[in-house]
């Protein structure tokens, strides 16, 4: 965030995907009671680890971390908790978290990530994601899935005003 001509740019997305994401993030922050900063914000979405050649329509799950980073850069929430895990979620215009597609795949990919420097030795990595997806992600051992319902709840967790319990994994049924 820089203090010159106001602009909110999402670099690396198609025009439509960037416009939709910007609108969801702006609206969710407004619903939270925060004014959108009158500054220059550039978010670069780099696709080097994505197998698809066109990620422009598949990154709505970055709405939550982008919104939280904007709040942290404004000093509205502390930065430290944001680095304690991975935050994923598509925001609705009202600030609610929408279900993710591929939560289990995302959780599995996080297990192989190098967490040194983020987690203390021996701690299990944290994955913050929509509450409806947390039991699915909790199927992966080696990660703690924590379910969120909204941007407001994510802010409360980041500010340590509320605690979350790890999700219980979905029950496996034998047929």
Regions of interest found by a model, annotated:
Residues 1-175:
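Peripheral, non-AAA+ core regions of ATP-driven protein-machinery
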């Amino acid at each position: 965030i820089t203090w010159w001509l106001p602009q909110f740019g999402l670099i690396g997305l198609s025009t439509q995907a960037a416009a939709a994401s910007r609108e969801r993030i702006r609206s969710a922050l407004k619903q939270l009671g925060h004014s959108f900063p009158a500054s220059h914000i550039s978010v670069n979405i780099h696709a080097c680890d994505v197998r698809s050649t066109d990620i422009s329509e598949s990154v709505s799950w970055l709405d939550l971390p982008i919104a939280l980073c904007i709040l942290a850069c404004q000093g509205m929430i502390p930065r430290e908790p944001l680095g304690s895990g991975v935050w994923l979620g598509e925001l609705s215009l009202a600030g609610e978290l929408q279900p993710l597609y591929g939560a289990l795949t995302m959780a599995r990919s996080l297990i192989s990530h190098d967490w040194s420097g983020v987690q203390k030795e021996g701690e299990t990595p944290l994955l913050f994601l929509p509450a409806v997806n947390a039991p699915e992600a909790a199927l992966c051992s080696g990660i703690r899935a924590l379910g969120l319902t909204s941007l407001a709840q994510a802010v409360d967790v980041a500010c340590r005003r509320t605690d979350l319990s790890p999700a219980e994994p979905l029950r496996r049924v034998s047929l």
